[in-house]
Amino acid sequence: MGELSEPPNGHVKNSVSWQTAHLKTRPKHFSTDILIAGGGLGGVAAALGALRRGRHVFLTEEYDWLGGQLTSQAVPPDEHTWVEQFGVTRSYRALRDGIRQYYRDNYPLTEEARRRAQLNPGAGHVSKLCHEPRVAVAVIEAMLMPFIGSGLLTVKKRVKAVSCEMVGQVVRSVEFRKLDDGGTFTVDAKYVIDATELGDLLPITKTPYVTGFESRKDTGEPSAPEEAQPQNSQAVSICFAVDHIEGEDHTIPKPERYDHWRSCHPDFWGAPLLGLKAPHPRTLEIVEREFTPNPNDDPASVISDQRKSGGDMNLWTFRRIAAKDNFIPGVYRSDICLVNWPMIDYFEKPIIDVSEAELQERLAEAASLSYSMLYYLQTDCPRADGKGTGYPGLRLRGDITGTEHGLAMAPYVRESRRIEAITTVVEQDLSLDVRGSKGAVHYPDSVGVGMYRIDLHPSTGGDNYIDVACYPFEIPLGALIPVERPNLLAASKNIGTTHITNGCYRLHPVEWNIGEAAGLLAAHCLDKELSPHEVRGKKQLFQEFQDMIIREGIETEWPDVSGY
């Protein structure tokens, strides 16, 4: 069959018009049972929880991909030692199992890798399941697809909340702006869940919240300062993926601010920011990391166990998301390394409660730091093989992160606005040093569990790492419920933690558990015609709710395990 001739101009015009004519008639007002703003891990889990209970859900997301820190932010999952056995929800385990099965069904794995029960596609040291972000996107979409087909779930991407309508203390509706064309629409909802990365709904709804570092006077935390520091937040990072093709030159143009970042020498860093030296998070000793692309290690021999080691001394394998030797020879020319390292932590200025112009300017600075680190690796980094400086074969893999600019689609946000909650989790609830042999505090209103060391990155207030060993902990329902706003729930890093305890509640499986509990709570309140405060406040009502979430696959307490 020959090439198609160009159709008449009128046909071209009509072919465009039928695709765009409906835009003027698209609805600008929606109603739903539960509105979830933010399609990160907390938002997705909240949606799944509510949908399984038969509720209509409207889910919005600022970026093209659902999944937040796991996908658009490109961060492989930070998980605890026992993740393969217990300590996560049933649906989070389904997500993990789905990712592994996706590789087995669609990737040319070696037979040995395919048979491995605990397949780690990237053989990264940070997690037992390091993988390419697109795979998680596909699995999340598949988990939600039946509910879209049934009409229970509506998803709107590339939108952001801009205003709301309140009736007394109740959030009646939220208005969203479309990022592509500037249009707006409004969603009425009986319950509203804030699962955004920065707690966007809190200032919009005038829900009382906290930012930055609380004072010791307010929280009693031993690691807190004497005075509150509301502008002192953890660094944000814009991650990126690279591979390395020896003999080729993929050097990017020199970033405009490269000289600035090359000369940056933070007082507490003990070395230039761009380099292989940085403080050790647990000891603060200045340690030089290894960087050797494609070390040809055996993927099956990699041990990923945060209890034994953070895994970050070898930067290439730390967060590697594709180990080429897991795949049939010749398919991958190189491993793929995900760069989320101390050297790209942007801690010059905060990004919370600033103007939109300031936010974009600071994120641009964070991006320039990431590009500069890549350029340093390509040109100035001392080579481990002694062959001078620079690895020009390092290739930026924007195709892996879904962007033309090459970096991750979204910034990796470690800290959010946090609600003034019924319950605030504090350091002394779970710190090994404070608790001694007693284990973490048991919350009678537990709706989940989590575990990670309290891990705070350098901050905009000039603080170095704060790294505190802790016990496996519980998630109190009271931390998801604001003191005010009876139909608003928190479902991400915006729950009732502190600057310090957010450092262990912000990780992937914990955020998922928080979101799932929030979605189940909203659905339960609608089913029983109760408020969240009533469910938590009366023992019998809470027990009924807790029994339900346990049946839904949420673990609410730990077996006898030790902290680290």
Describe the function of each predicted region.
Residues 46-51, 518-522:
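Small-residue (primarily alanine) positions within well-ordered alpha-helices
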Residues 32, 54, 189-190:
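Short, well-ordered alpha-helix to beta-strand connector turns
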Residues 4-18, 25, 69, 157-158, ...:
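Flavin (FAD/FMN)-binding glycine-rich loop and adjacent Rossmann-like elements that form
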Residues 43:
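N-terminal Rossmann-fold NAD(P) dinucleotide-binding loop
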